[in-house]
Amino acid sequence: MPKIRRRVGKKSNHMKKSILFLLLACSIYSYGATAAKTQQVKRYAISETAMLNRFLDYVAIESASFYPTADEYPMTDGQKEMGDRLAADAKKLHADVTLSQWGYVYVNIPSNVKKQVPTIGVVCHMDITPETPSKGIKPTVLKYEGGIINLGNGIIDPNTPQGADLNNLIGKTLIHTDGTTILGGDDKNGCAILMSIIETVQKKGFKHGPLQFVFCPNEDVGLAALKIDTTYFNPDILIDVDLDGGQKVAVSNFTAEGLKVRFVGNDVHPAAAKELHLADALAAVSTYIARMPLQYRPENTEGKQGYIQAYQLEQLSDKVSYTIETRIRYFDKKEGDEFNRILRENLQYVRESFPYVKVEIMNEGLQYANVEYTMHPQSIPLIKAAATRCQIELDFEDLRAGTTAAMLSTKGLPGGMSLFSGQHNEHSVYEYSVLEEMYDAYILLLTMIDEIQK
């Protein structure tokens, strides 16, 4: 019996070694196959230097948008110049380009493979924020070696919130300003990435399905979707290139609704208030605000919890009437329904409690929607497969904000992921971009395009 055990043990050990060897061989083969697939894409890719030069050309164009009045379309000369430049660049690459009267630049690239595959659409925006100075942007390219970055007019310190990412960026190529303006990486990073993709897929031999691109104006004033033409841009899988950092992918976001209400008052002497029908609009609007449930205030929510916030109160010219604006944000549609019920009941209570105050809804409706509701089922598996090939570790997020893709969803377009683009400290004079993160986004998108046609 002991002899039998020894013989079985030797076979067992031999079998274990064989299995381990087989697993190791499979692992090496898998790694090699993945690397080979990635190299297939990279052999068509432009260089980091070419992307940097393109980016520097784009940030030299001051393309700030502005907040319009109700009766004007906010197209600026800088955005027109940027749109003209993008359209010209795409035409030089022999792409099918349309520059619309509203300033959108559409690029359509037909499939060059026989089988039917979903259309991938990629979007970014050409404007930069009007909230921070942007005249005379002076970019500096720096190979970061650690420590404080001297901008000339201020610093970026790794020990401050503005420098929180720097410790992970040693050895990377950073582009920053002189500290008096923004850089414009939000979203000139995206513009450079998209144009680099257009250049690459136009090269002979790069196989791809149908591709659509759009460079939007007015995103930073919340109007990227206002005049988009879905006859030119109507993809199955939508990707928005506008997130910060080098790993983030937003796969869901707040749905945003807004409500603006006017409370019309009538002032009389308090002694005769009952007889003369005092309409105390200030008391009415205060009651409306006070009845908002405290557990749904923004400061009491996190993660995928939504909120209600009455945020802007304005006294009108008659001094006795007021408008109040309320925002609601949610991920879950059921929570959104509950928030709307609360607001309706709240307004009804105010009407009954202040019968002489006229309560008028001036504006209400959807501002942007959670992309998760309508996202193509292949979107997330596709980006995961591409990330595996590129050996990029992604950080999937539920974004407590809106995105360009979320704005576009209100126009009937499918929900889209938002992808990192190498931006940091956007909307501030401490803004900087990271070239290697931009390049990672570019390679990842190319790999997605390659992956889906296979």
Please identify what each model-predicted range represents.
Residues P2, K10-S18:
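Positively charged n-region of N-terminal signal peptides that target proteins for export
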Residues S18-C26:
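Sec-dependent N-terminal signal peptides
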Residues V41, I46-D77, I175-H176, H424-S428:
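N-terminal capping segment at the start of a domain
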Residues K115-K207, F215, P235, D440:
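Active-site metal-coordination/substrate-binding segment of hydrolases
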Residues L166, K172-I182, N218-E338, Q348, ...:
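Midchain, well-structured core segments that form catalytic/ion-binding scaffolds
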Residues A283-N300, Y307-Q309, K358, L366-S418:
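Active-site-adjacent substrate-binding region
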Residues D318, L394-T447:
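Zn-dependent metallopeptidase/amidohydrolase metal-coordination segment
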